[in-house]
């Protein structure tokens, strides 16, 4: 059986990237919360 995580740089950026987060209200909320918490990386 193969593992579930098969990393791909492009796919990761497309799904969890900054621009994708900025597109939706919910995504902007995620970024806002991560900024408030002081996360070093906001998104993939």
Curated annotation (Swiss-Prot):
Keywords, comma-separated and alphabetical: Ribonucleoprotein, Ribosomal protein
GO terms of biological process kind: translation
Gene3D superfamilies: 1.10.287.3980
Annotated GO MF terms: structural constituent of ribosome
Pfam family, one: Ribosomal_L34
UniProt region (Disordered), positions on chain: 1-44
Homology family: Belongs to the bacterial ribosomal protein bL34 family.
Protein's name according to its UniProt entry: Large ribosomal subunit protein bL34
């Amino acid at each position: 059986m193969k593992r579930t995580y098969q990393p791909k740089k492009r796919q990761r950026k497309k799904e969890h990237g900054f621009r994708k987060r900025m597109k939706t209200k919910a995504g902007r909320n995620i970024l806002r919360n991560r900024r408030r918490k002081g996360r070093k990386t906001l998104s993939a």
